[in-house]
């Protein structure tokens, strides 16, 4: 049959005689149709989700101590007498930037820096508490997992303020006024960040630090410099220790199945 040949011929002529306006319309239609195609979502790859539970029969842990080498800087006495309520707190009070006991360093944030997947805090995890007591932030350093919340309390008989100063855009700055013995307020922290400063606008000596970890494997050293990170899947990790004024140190550490790996860091005055 000759019908197919006849159908093709007028189409060929139509394409030759098409105007610029028609060409533009055809291109616009093609672009519109291509734009209707679904594009892959990047949310799953950029937004951390709760990590699956590790096999409890194989997990291990890391225990260690953070040491301080040399003579620690002298802690400076704080004058709280500008506020009568603060003046009634136990005196004297001292700065907390570097606290060393028997060559062991407190308030160091220790966490798995690499080797563990980033994950958000599981739903229902209680907030981490930062209290204002004795006109101080207690504890001086706190840590939570990204996606978690911090709860700010005021246990004092005077007004306080919680002013957070994040550098990560996904962590919103908070400037919270908290009257004496007021109801606690909470704030979310959605992005990993180290040593995020907290200040009180009413009492300039008050300061603390919030650490937002990318995974659930972290700790803050106690007064004796000790720390423990539990429930780690077997593997090799980069373990980081971060101090507010002394900086950061990293080491490689391997956690065998059902075992305890030992770690040690040593800081000194810069």
Model-derived features: positions:
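Generic N-terminal leader/processing signal
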Residues: 9-14, 35, 197
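Extracytoplasmic copper-binding redox domains, predominantly the cupredoxin/blue-copper superfamily
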Residues: 36-270
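Bacterial N-terminal signal peptides that target proteins for export
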Residues: 11-25
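Bacterial N-terminal signal peptides
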Residues: 23-34
